[in-house]
């Protein structure tokens, strides 16, 4: 019977942050300064506690219930989660409604498409 080489299992997490679009560059810089350069960024729409906003447009009141947001996703080892979360919070916070939310999600495995290499 052939034995497979043992590899150290590293717990991975995906940190998903929904932030104000104008805070993206600050968040990228804060993450890069701490050595976290890989990320996926998506422009999204959403709402939370504030349930949208009312604006004046050409003399009329307009309700916008889905606001422009930016989603930043970073996959890191379990022991780096707190550092990533702190970097995002400190660089994205304005103290006002609409600053966003951070979610931490377990990652079961990762497959590098180019090589097929799996990380568990």
UniProtKB/Swiss-Prot annotation:
ATP binds at residues 40, 48-50, 75, 98-101. GO terms for cellular component: cytosol. Its main location: cytoplasm. GO terms for biological process: regulation of nitrogen utilization. PROSITE patterns: PII_GLNB_CTER, PII_GLNB_DOM. GO terms for molecular function: ATP binding; enzyme regulator activity. Gene3D superfamilies: 3.30.70.120. Homotrimer. Interacts and forms a complex with Amt1. Belongs to the P(II) protein family. This is Nitrogen regulatory protein GlnK1. It comes from Archaeoglobus fulgidus (strain ATCC 49558 / DSM 4304 / JCM 9628 / NBRC 100126 / VC-16).
